[in-house]
A protein has these predicted regions:
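Non-catalytic pre-domain segments flanking phosphatase-related domains
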Residues: 4-5, 22-81
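Stable alpha-helical elements in mature extracytoplasmic
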Residues: 51-62, 117-124, 145, 149, ...
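C-terminal cap/substrate-recognition subdomain and adjoining C-terminal extension
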Residues: 28-40, 53, 75, 133, ...
Length: 223
């Protein structure tokens, strides 16, 4: 004889509740990475020395390319460098901000002109200068930071350059459009850009460079 449902109610209700809760849980494959875990991973990437090693792994062949390409070349040669996380490091600022970004806080930091050089990339810069290859900096920084940026570059041993190209204060173009147009202008001045360095894909897309070299940047993305 089948027992009445009420005899199973005490067992069935917890099971049904558990099933309901399970069905409401986020699908792991759709959940974004945990923010705390992501911050810890970035910190470990830096503290372990892997970040520096990855930069060095980009800088070493870049130096060799500049030496090779500039050997007995009659052309007007140039290299293009991005600034933030390519030649100057903002780690101190980003760590103090717990990896967050606020425009006003960033502007204050930029005006301190205290970002240290990324040493392997300064070696690349020194190689270009020694081989009389013109250096151009093209940065997403705005015009109002120009003076501080020039001072920062000079203080960090990178004060010899053909031009520092910054974005107009009212610029709304994407990074790709802005930087591509500026590289095009450099080539129109008769230069052959033999290398373009950046930490964002948007620093390098758009052409007008024989070779591109991408530095690691796990901190932020500029589309």
């Amino acid at each position: 004889m089948m027992k009445p449902f009420r005899e199973f109610a005490g067992l069935a209700l917890p099971w049904l509740l558990a099933l309901g809760l399970a069905s409401c849980a986020a699908t792991p494959s759709r959940a974004p990475a945990n923010l705390t875990d992501a911050k810890l991973a970035v910190g470990n990437y830096i503290d372990s020395g892997t970040y520096h090693a990855d930069i060095t792994a980009v800088a070493a062949p870049a130096k060799q390319w500049i030496l090779q390409r500039s050997q007995n070349s009659p052309e007007k040669l140039a290299v293009v460098f991005d600034i933030d996380e390519t030649t100057l490091s903002n780690l101190k600022h980003m760590q103090a901000a717990d990896w967050g970004y606020q425009a006003k806080v960033w502007d204050t930091w930029a005006h301190t002109a205290s970002a240290p050089a990324i040493l392997p990339m300064r070696d690349v810069y020194d190689t270009a200068v020694a081989r009389k290859v013109a250096v151009f900096f093209i940065t997403g920084r705005k015009e109002f930071t120009r003076r501080a940026t020039v001072q920062n570059l000079r203080d960090q041993g990178m004060g010899h350059f053909q031009a520092l190209i910054v974005r107009p204060n009212d610029s709304t173009n994407s990074a790709v459009l802005f930087k591509t147009a500026e590289r095009k202008r450099i080539t129109e001045q008769g230069y052959s850009i033999i290398a373009n360095f950046g930490d964002q894909t948007s620093d390098l897309a758009g052409g007008y460079a024989e070779r591109t070299f991408k530095l690691p940047n796990p901190f932020y993305l500029i589309p």
